[in-house]
Amino acid sequence: MSSFESDSASDAESAFSDASSDFTPSSSVKSKGKVPLRDSTNTTAQPSAPATGDASDQYQKLSQLEHILKRPDTYIGSVEKTGVEMWSFDAATESMIYKEVHIVPGLYKIFDEILVNAADNKIRDPSMRNIKVNIDAENNTISVMNDGKGIPIEIHKKEKIYIPELIFGNLLTSSNYDDDEKKVTGGRNGYGAKLCNIFSTEFVLETADLNTSQVYKQTWTNNMANLTKPKITKLKSKKEYTKVTFKPDLSKFHMEMLDDDILSVLRRRVYDLCGTVKDCNIYLNDKKLSIRNFKSYVEMYVNAIRERSPDPVAPEGETRNYSTIVHEVFNDRWEVAFAVSDGSFNQVSFVNSIATTSGGTHVKYVSDQIITKLIDALTKKEKGKKKLNIKPQEVRNNMFVFINCLIENPAFTSQTKEQLTTRVAQFGGKPSEKIVISDQFIAKILKTSIADKIRTIVNANEDKEMSKADGSRKSRIKNQVKLVDANKAGTKEGYKCTLILTEGDSAMPLAVAGLTVVGRDYYGCFPLRGKLLNVREASIEQVSKNAEINSIKQIMGLQHKKRYTPENIKSLRYGHIMIMTDQDQDGSHIKGLIINFLETSFPGLLEIPGFLLEFITPIVKVTITGRGNHRVIPFYNMPEFEKWRETEGTTCKWKHKYFKGLGTSLESEGREYFAALDRHMKSFHALQDGDSQYIDMAFSKKKADERKDWLQAFRPGTHLDPQIREIPISEFINKELILFSMADNVRSIPSILDGFKPGQRKVLYGCFKRNLRSEIKVAQLVGYISEHTGYHHGEGSLAQTIVGLAQNFVGANNLNLLQPIGLFGSRAAGGKDFSAVRYIHTNITDLTRVIFNPLDDDLYTYVQDDAQTVEPEAYLPIIPMLLVNGAEGIGTGWSTNIPSFNPVDIVANIRRMMNGEEPVDMTPWFKGWEGDLERISPEKYKVSGKIEQVDDDTVEITEIPIKTWTNSVKEFLLAGLGNDKPWIKDMEEQHGINIRFVVRLSKEEMDKSLRMGLLERFKLISSISLSNMVAFDPQGRIKKYSSANEILKDYYWARLELYQRRKDMMAENFQNQLTRLSEQARFIKLIIEKKLTIANKKRSEMVDDLKKLKFTRFNKNGKPVHDEPLVEAEELAEEEEEAAGDISQLNLGLVAPEDESQYKPETTYSQYDYLLGMAIWSLTRERYEKLLRQRDEKQEELNELLKKSAKDLWNSDLDDFLVGWEEFLRADIEARNSFGPTAKTSTRKRARKSTKSEPAQKKTKSSTPKASTPTIKAEATPAQPVVKEETNKQPDLLSFFSKEPSVAKTVSAAPPKRKTPKSKPKKEIVSLFSDSSDDDITSFSVGDAKPTPKPSTNNILDELEDLKSSTFTPKVGAAGRRRPKSYALAESDGNESDEDYMSE
């Protein structure tokens, strides 16, 4: 007990033995000129003078000893018996018990002071092993003895008395007054043991000092008023000790004896030492206590709690270890244990062995950490919730915290030391000695019942919060302005009423119009604003603040957590809900969300038959227009309409109208619908077994894997039976809601064929349809695409899609299909920093039409949207753009993340597959990126930037991980430069062509960074995963691919099949031209030989003659007509003029009629126009001979085509692509190396240049493609040069015949072009269906037209050279790549307007 409570003046040693001889101090111990303290008289022992009543008698001066005895509560607490609930030790059961005891706090405190002194000695002398406490209640005697160093037995140099007497018999003496010395003992103010002495009738001190080999013993009596001379004897053993024995002055505490209550508390305090003093044996009444450490000490409390509150049952599927103590020794100074309390916060804490029964800053600091981390951990488990709806105090009330800590120079609220006041920052210790609650500690706590208790509290709070928005059955609701309330709602007949929930405000007029039919007594309407919240995993905050849900609850009168049955449904304002949404996928989703809301919050409602209804309206109305068969057929879903169109729709004439939304219908139609309410109203079947599981699968975030299986099992054509009157919820989910989920995935997941999502596909289709050749404002292009491609979403999203297709900074597209003419975003912000779309321009790039070959356009299947033909279901470019540019997206149940790869590697693998070889593994590649890729697993790559140390205190960052943007790195560096503990001295940005951050560090931080690794310290490492490559396969099914080569293989076979179809189409077109030329030659020959006369004949007579001569008929698409029945001209006489106007507006190539069934068949007349439309001057023998030569040439071209395989055609396209790719890379390098004000100008020049094509006969093999489409050479023999279009036209064969529309006229049918300067050469017209009756009949070359590439300038270009020279033996030119008739276009000179040739 080393001079108790730090009261010793020096470290000395003691021993467990009595002195063998007496020792009498000499008179020299008395100081000169000063009376020793032991000889002074305590003034408290003298009687005070009686008061005389004057002012002097009213004001007294007391000595400190007198003050302590008169005002003991200031020093030791109350000296009156006080009833208080606290932990005590039950000697009978030998266990802790929490009960109300009546004790005198002052008596407890003086005992505690002696006990703490004994514990403090363990800090001074770690070799101390024993503390022995004896409590003799009968004799009112308490003794505390400890081994270890004793009190120095020597004379104090200044006070001239023995040090033991100084520190135990004189106030304000201590060794703790040096505040510069950091101590973790309990003594602090110099009172301690003296207070015990003062409040004792007898106080005996005994200590042994090994240094002097003496034993010191001294006795004080009469409240420290009297003392004996010290008895000093010789120490016989070599063990030091200190022992204090005292008899409390029970009269001062108004007690007669030590009763059971105070004894139980004193015994508990002795047990406290078992837990707080490490490696020390604790004895009580000569019995060694079995508690060995803090954890076993805590178990005594937990066992007591368990006896009062048995363990609850753990939730199913979870493990709860309620009885185990969560205990951790964090460091030498902090030891913490946790248990679950029984409803109120409990703490048992010790500071330097002092029992802080009222807690303090140390308890708050630890418990606050536990509470915060508990809430955070439970919040993470409750996905979708920002924070649990619980207050920290509510968590605290369920905690029992045990703390044993050492704090330097602790401060308390008073001398009683019940509450620590030391600030956290002054706890002291090294950083490693601070207390930080670990995640492992929290994880263990979560396995106790605290988690369940917190959830119970959260649920109660949420219920309380949700109840605030509860409705009630009242006749009028005043705060819902948009509600059209039923007159009977909220009355005793309210259960008969039906609330119609419409999809948005636009549908309200239709519903309100219907109320004029059914009346307003039992029907009300309310518009839903957008889609209802998915409440399944939503936080209570989200649900309680959701306006739509609160409105429904108020309007319906729903009360939170009330279980509704057919018996109590009369308590609602409405007895039914009827959903009235659009008949599209989004409408189905809204229905599903309402079902999900009811099943989650009010499941009883769905169990009531007829509660939930839906109102259906037609999505398509078909009007049969045939004579005597005029009728209207409504269709309520698209699969049903598509099936009808392919069957019955082919047998009659009809027209149709799409109803994309309820707002499309007229109010009169609304009244018509409600008049036939039974036909348009369907009910949902009451909840059946398994329905809840389907709802959970469709809407729970936890069921993502199940949704994947559900969507993979989908088959096109799936739809809900329109005849069913009562819809099972499972049927609705599996046959209607699934259509929305599939549509969501289609919007979010790309196709393997073209790598596009629908929005991107629409953009490209719109550019092709517009025949985009010169730059156009993005804002203008947005409007055009929105109008012509059936885009039904916001134009802002469409603009972002266009910008995304044009972005070419590092980390964006490897191959941008649109030109970024302007500021389209940068690597700094990941492209989000693009300029307003009204300022930036775009155009298709040179390579776009090389990759998306026009010859394929007629081979695609095009989507029908609202009676309009729009983009193809999927393009099939000559290389897989999904691998070239990669893709990311999040759909329903599925997401995708596909990195980009090098087009050179892709082409090489395609050619390997052409040669029957297996493709080799490809590594992700990003144009312009110079970082490092390292494969760390089959499905993962490590992505590293570049950083190097340039001198002792400087590093340079010259590359960052791909998809990490410059601004993010800058933010990280600035945070290191300016936070509370900056580790960066300075940072500069010196970006030029490439990234360059220059960062300066201190020597210490540089050393630390080098130890950690520069890449790691500066967070220049990320990863690329190949484990989530999802796309729609060629059959339109969602598929997860395991590798890039698996994607390539699926693409390869689809593309190869399309090449075969292209070849077949080209061969068929060549054959048709041969037939056409032959028939024209035969026609001219008959005219010349006068075997056929056309002059002075009626039109019908001429057609009859041609029929008899069996001339082949050709339809408007240039194909021969063989089997179609002829329509007699007489029957079509009236219809022909009307049809001519409509048919002339049809697109003759890509775009089909809006609805083919609305148009009349072709007439026989038009099918002979290729003969009767020939100019008169063509009827000559020269023309006849020329046609025969052209026929032979065409036959030769056909023979050349038939010699080639599909692979030959593909390889030829790949050759052209590689040449264009080389030029593309050169231009990209030049653009990135360009600086100054001329950069933008040069970009625009290139854009204009790309729209100008040289005449075909002037091109050489060394030239590279400049046009946005592959050039198709129109070659002619020397003897027969290509004839230009004549400006002076000859008279027509018959005055009422019009010359057959040439391809040039097809192009010019659109709005007139701006005039071209005369100096510009005329552009040749190239057509696969060249059918002009004059000399302008074009032949096609099948020779090798592969241009020679320019010399390579870098490694990428060298790879291109190697690839072109070493793979795939056959070398086939660009011969078969000809435009179909629909793409027969005059070359642009750059000044022409963009013509919409697809709409002509």
Curated annotation (Swiss-Prot):
SUBUNIT field: Homodimer.
List of residues binding ATP: 117, 146, 174-176, 187-194, 415-417
Catalytic activity: ATP-dependent breakage, passage and rejoining of double-stranded DNA
GO biological process: chromatin remodeling at centromere; DNA strand elongation involved in DNA replication; DNA topological change; regulation of mitotic recombination; replication fork progression beyond termination site; resolution of meiotic recombination intermediates; rRNA transcription; sister chromatid segregation
Location within or outside the cell: Nucleus
Site (Interaction with DNA): K531, N534, R707, K708, K757, Y791, S797, W965
GO cellular component: DNA replication termination region; synaptonemal complex
Cofactor binding note: Binds two Mg(2+) per subunit. The magnesium ions form salt bridges with both the protein and the DNA. Can also accept other divalent metal cations, such as Mn(2+) or Ca(2+).
Full protein name: DNA topoisomerase 2
Compositional bias of kind Polar residues: 39-57
Site (Important for DNA bending): I890
Compositional bias ranges of the Acidic residues kind: 1389-1400
Site (Transition state stabilizer): R838
Superkingdom field: Eukaryota
Active-site residues from the entry: Y839 (o-(5'-phospho-dna)-tyrosine intermediate)
Region named Disordered: 1-57, 1235-1400
Keyword Transferase: no
Cofactor(s) recorded in Swiss-Prot or TrEMBL: Mg(2+); Mn(2+); Ca(2+)
Listed SMART domains: HATPase_c, TOP2c, TOP4c
More info: Eukaryotic topoisomerase I and II can relax both negative and positive supercoils, whereas prokaryotic enzymes relax only negative supercoils.
